Amino acid sequence: MFNPFSSTKRLLGTGALLAAGWWTFLAPLETDSANPVNETENGSFDHKSELLDNANHFRLWARQTLAHYTSSPTPFGENEQKNFRPALRIGTLHVNDLNLPKFQKEKVLFLMREFGRQCDLIALQGMEPNQQEVLVEWIAELAQQNMDYGYLAGPNVGRAGQQRQFAFIYNKSKLETDRTQLYTLKDPQDLILFDPLVAWFRVRGIDPSRAFTFTLVNMELSDPAFGKEQNLLEEIVQSIRNDGRREDDIILAGSFECAVQNIPLCNDGWLGVLGDMPTDPSFQKRRDNILIQSRTTEEFLGKGEVFDFLRAYNLTVQEAIQISQHLPAWGEFSALEGGFQ
């Protein structure tokens, strides 16, 4: 016999499950803009902000877990889509002692070409001073695959005998930038070995008022055993927030040389899009990450991956280290401001 109440319960149950799934995996992350620092105007603790933070962390964990178990483990292949992606893929790549002769080695060239074409924007670390020829050659390699990329290169940074040059490459059909807004963070007290490189980007191809705009910071920190550069990240972020552009979406990409839970900034609402994934060829160390502020950068889609080029190219750990002591990695973001696709 038909029971209308039983049918109604099933419908309500299905609706509740669908709503919970949408909230967990699809809805933009929530933020309490009235009290952005977990404190009310009278100084008392804001439990609403605490609940929002906990909810956001749960949803990001759920999205990362889903992405991990549903993404293809197959290395980047020839059949992967090369056209405009609705999502923006931001990567970080550290190639030790990178210069033109090293870039031209077959396996290094293949890694940078393959990883380059799979990302819309890459923060590059490890390049030796005055090596813009590497960037020109890299762009030319991508152009042979009908991909239009540009680059931004910073000045040499570091101390005598220990210098680097940071750079970005970006998909010009997907992103625009303002070269006048490219700058190296000033460090008059010489507290950090390699001064971070800061750039501004906006997604192209959609209404500029709806396009995701953000600041990307390229950085390479020293091992915590030899310094306390990780403790400077909050001050670095604050300096960038006050640079006159009023950009709320700040993304830090590069080498942090420690697990995300050991980065003080990540105890204050920031998170690493790679979670606790190892990022060295031996899969023992947490060296690299992409950090975002979970309460302001709602555009993060909950997906971050490390490119295991050892498996992709059938290399030993020692062979891989000759290419890089770091594994490339990326995170995916919505192309639209606020995370709506």
What feature does the model see in each segment?
Residues 81-90, 173-176, 191-219, 338-340:
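Beta-strand-turn-beta hairpins that frame and shape the catalytic cleft
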Residues 2-74, 240-248, 258-341:
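Metal-dependent phosphoester-hydrolase catalytic domains
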Residues 95-100, 127-132, 156-161, 173-176, ...:
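Solvent-exposed loop/turn segments at secondary-structure junctions
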Residues 70, 130-208:
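Structured beta-strand-rich core segments of catalytic domains in phosphoester-bond hydrolases
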Residues 199-277:
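Extracytoplasmic, non-cytosolic globular domains
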Residues 87, 92-106:
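Acidic/histidine-rich helix-loop elements
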Residues 123-125, 152-155, 251-255, 272-276, ...:
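Active-site neighborhood of phospho(di)ester-bond hydrolases with catalytic His/Asp-centered motifs
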